[in-house]
Amino acid sequence: KGSLGAEPTYQKKEVFTMLTICIILIVLLALDLLFTLALRCRKGHPKWELLKKYRYAHRGFHDKPVIPENSLPAFRRAIEHGFGAELDVHLLKDGTLAVFHDSDLRRCANVDGQIEDLTLEELKQLRLEGTDEQIPTFDEVLALFESATPLIIELKTARGNHQALAKAVCERLDTYKGEFCIESFDPFALIDVKKLRPEICRGQLSMNFEKDKAGLPWYKRFIAGNLLLNFLTVPDFIAYKFEDRKGYCLRACVRTWGAQEVSWTIRKKEDLLACEADGSIPIFECFDPDEP
């Protein structure tokens, strides 16, 4: 008699357990779906057929201390060797676009200040890394590459100027006849490019920010390193630090969404060959990939 009375209670517990398991599974599947959607990329941009044919010299094919980075001789040397080039673009206070890596002028120009605070006239008074080379404008670099090899153009934002920078670069590229793609660490710059010129091949730069915290709060490191704003930027490619290339989210972007992978910055021939064997496009420096 006691066992008969306990049976309904047992069945209720069993049903409750099954419902709990089902709810947990549904929640996990929903989270997995949301996570996958957050990593969204755009597959098969028509530019890849050409862009994938090249290796890209990081800030030009520089040879310090004689040929400084992001200098016209470095870009000419890249073209002469048949390489594409990666470069960095800043917006000056007078609207000029300049090719330079850091916002801070100290490392490469040996003066205090921010490049965004300069005019073109002030920019041309500076010299690169103790040489006689000037900091080039974006126009000067584009003139070299227009009938030559492709460019990977990184948008270097500062002080929330992502919209103005993206607009200036897109408008200048409207009349450019050469081959190029655009990348940035700043997802808001890519959102601007997407809105202004959706046809442009665009890429999200990233890395494992937990290894190099870069002054970012933990949540920004997590979001940026795991590419969780892709659903807003919808990049055609992911340019990820080569040493961090095994990261789960990067691999998911490539496998699930078909994103093109670009690897930076490669400094050894064996790493370059490993990168290309994986189908990634290399951005290299400090060696000649064509030398045995």
Regions found by a protein language model. Give the residues of each.
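Short, Lys/Arg-enriched N-terminal segments with co-localized hydrophobic residues
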Residues: 1-17
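Phosphate-group recognition and catalysis centered on beta-loop-alpha active-site segments
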Residues: 16-292
